[in-house]
Regions:
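The conserved acidic donor/metal-binding loop of glycosyltransferases
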Residues: 113-117
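Short, acidic, metal-binding catalytic loop of nucleotide-sugar glycosyltransferases
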Residues: 25-41
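Short beta-strand/loop segment that forms part of the nucleotide-sugar
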Residues: 41-52, 76-80
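Cell-envelope/extracellular polymer assembly enzymes that use nucleotide-activated donors
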Residues: 5-10, 44
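Conserved catalytic core of nucleotide-sugar-dependent glycosyltransferases
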Residues: 101-102, 119-173
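Active-site beta-to-alpha loop of glycosyltransferases that engages the nucleotide-sugar donor
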Residues: 10-27, 51-53
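Active-site-proximal specificity loops/subdomain of glycosyltransferases
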Residues: 58-103
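Short aromatic/hydrophobic "clamp" motif used to bind/position activated sugar donors
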Residues: 109
C-alpha cells in the first residue's frame, strides 16, 4: 500500500433538497487537488456515499472516472441500512467516514464536510503536522453563493468566499 501524506475524507448522500451537493463536492475536490499539487503534498480524497432508494442521483453520475483520477479522488459507496442502528438516528456521517478511513492510505487524515473549502494557509501548514496530534482550524461561514454551483469555477468561488465572510469560528491550531 502506497502511503500518502494526507487523506481527505468526507461524506455525501444526494437526495431530496441536496441536488447541488454533487457540484459542491466537485469544488471541494478541485480545491484540495489544486492546493496539494501546488504545495507538493501527496494526497487522496475519499468520499463516502450512502446509497439506497432515496438517492435522486449518484455521485458517479456527476463526477467522471477521468475527473476522479485526475484529482486523486475515489467514491466509496456504503449502505447506512447495513449498520446496526436501534435508535434510528441519521448516521450518514459516521458509517461513510469510517468506511473511508478504513481504506485510507494517509499518514494524516482530514475529516471535513463536503462543502468546505480550505485556503492556502491550511495547506501550507500540512508540512508541519506531527504524529499523534489533533488539529482544528479556523473556519469561516460565508453568504450563499451568487451563482449556480453547476457552473461555478473554483477561483471565482474562493474569491467570492474571501469577500463575503459572515462569521469566524475557532482560531486555534
Amino acid at each position: 500500500m502506497e502511503e500518502k501524506t494526507i487523506s481527505f475524507i468526507t461524506s455525501v448522500k444526494i437526495c431530496k433538497g441536496y441536488h447541488d451537493f454533487g457540484h459542491r463536492i466537485r469544488l471541494y475536490i478541485e480545491n484540495i487537488s489544486f492546493h496539494c499539487k501546488k504545495c507538493n503534498i501527496d494526497f487522496e480524497v475519499l468520499i463516502g456515499e450512502d446509497v439506497d432508494d432515496k438517492n435522486e442521483i449518484f455521485l458517479s453520475e456527476i463526477l467522471s472516472d477521468d475527473f476522479l483520477k485526475k484529482h486523486n479522488a475515489q467514491i466509496i459507496q456504503t449502505q447506512q441500512s447495513s449498520y446496526k442502528n436501534p435508535l434510528k438516528y441519521n448516521m450518514l456521517e459516521a458509517p461513510n467516514k469510517n468506511a473511508c478511513m478504513y481504506k485510507s492510505k494517509g499518514k494524516f487524515i482530514c475529516f471535513t464536510s463536503g462543502d468546505v473549502l480550505m485556503n492556502s494557509e491550511f495547506f501550507d501548514y500540512i508540512h508541519k503536522f506531527q504524529e499523534n496530534s489533533f488539529y482544528r482550524f479556523l473556519t469561516y461561514e460565508v453568504k450563499a453563493l451568487d451563482c449556480d454551483f453547476e457552473n461555478a469555477k473554483l477561483d471565482y468561488v474562493l474569491d467570492y468566499c474571501s469577500r463575503n465572510i459572515l462569521r469566524c469560528y475557532n482560531d486555534t491550531y
